[in-house]
């Protein structure tokens, strides 16, 4: 089945926040990210995770990053690796609602061994991105150890490292569909009209986003969003589809308020979401739910929206 994802689809997929909920209601996410020179990727992903609604977040980082996180993002709890510069030791993961790994991780031999232990020990789906994908592409046996219903988020070059060079975009898409079904995972094949391939063979095409989002840090933010949704007990397929759409919508709002060329992962701009958008018959439900997530836009593109 091939589907184009719309605002209406997303509006009915988003969960409401119950008045008597507490932070435990919205899950505890574990993000394994960052290495020497790449702590910014971990920080962007972590902020996106909490801004997307996760109740609690623990970030496993090299010890070198402790002062960075404690200063820049005090809301996140830290799990410190034994290595000062990169991921080498596996934290206890049994108590977390969802696990994500990859942003800024680096590609070290000890990291590869630690990733294998994560895959073998996790009883929950794992979001796998960036350097975690690259490590696995160099150790293809690791793909047979991915927990079912996990989510891979490769861009085209990363996917080609996994499945081999593709002759064109359609060839790559068919490979992604087959790979997702074979390994019983979701694949988020990033790009224009990002395609989400489900284990059942369904493909969902995202209908929003723009070229301004092709910028450093954008993928790290997407990982944080999807991880957050998984922690909040969305199904992996729904977390991937909703996460990609929210990410694209944030980019479209930012592009409307600034040029695509000027978009970076933390531009500051101030614009208003018009009341007509919020109240229109067709978009009202979507935007009323979207307003709950407006702080996310500030993290993705520095977008501060006043209502």
What is each stretch, according to the model?
Residues 1-127, 134-151, 156-307:
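Small-residue (G/A/S/T)-rich helix-start motifs and N-terminal tracts that mark the onset
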């Amino acid at each position: 089945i091939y589907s184009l994802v719309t605002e209406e689809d997303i509006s009915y997929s988003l969960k409401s926040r119950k008045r008597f909920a507490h932070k435990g209601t919205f899950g505890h996410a574990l993000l394994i990210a960052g290495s020497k020179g790449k702590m910014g990727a971990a920080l962007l992903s972590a902020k996106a995770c909490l801004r997307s609604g996760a109740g609690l977040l623990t970030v496993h980082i090299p010890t070198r990053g402790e002062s960075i996180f404690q200063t820049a993002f005090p809301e996140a709890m830290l799990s410190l690796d034994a290595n000062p510069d990169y991921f080498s030791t596996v934290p206890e993961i049994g108590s977390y609602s969802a696990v994500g790994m990859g942003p800024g991780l680096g590609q070290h031999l000890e990291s590869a061994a630690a990733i294998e232990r994560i895959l073998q020990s996790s009883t929950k789906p794992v979001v796998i991105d960036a350097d975690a994908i690259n490590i696995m592409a160099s150790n293809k046996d690791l793909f047979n150890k991915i927990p079912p219903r996990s989510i891979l988020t490769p861009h085209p070059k990363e996917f080609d490292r996994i499945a081999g060079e593709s002759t064109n975009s359609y060839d790559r898409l068919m490979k992604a569909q087959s790979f997702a079904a074979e390994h019983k995972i979701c694949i988020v094949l990033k790009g224009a009209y990002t395609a989400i391939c489900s284990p059942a063979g369904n493909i969902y095409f995202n209908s929003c986003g723009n070229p301004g989002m092709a910028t450093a840090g954008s993928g790290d933010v997407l990982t944080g969003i999807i991880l957050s949704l998984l922690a909040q007990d969305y199904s992996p397929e729904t977390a991937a589809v909703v996460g990609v759409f929210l990410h694209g919508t944030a980019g479209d709002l930012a592009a409307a308020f600034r040029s695509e060329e000027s978009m970076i992962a933390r531009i500051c701009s101030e614009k208003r979401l018009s009341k007509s958008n919020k109240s229109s018959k067709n978009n009202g439900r979507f935007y009323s739910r979207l307003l709950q997530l407006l702080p996310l836009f500030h993290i993705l593109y520095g977008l501060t929206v006043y209502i």
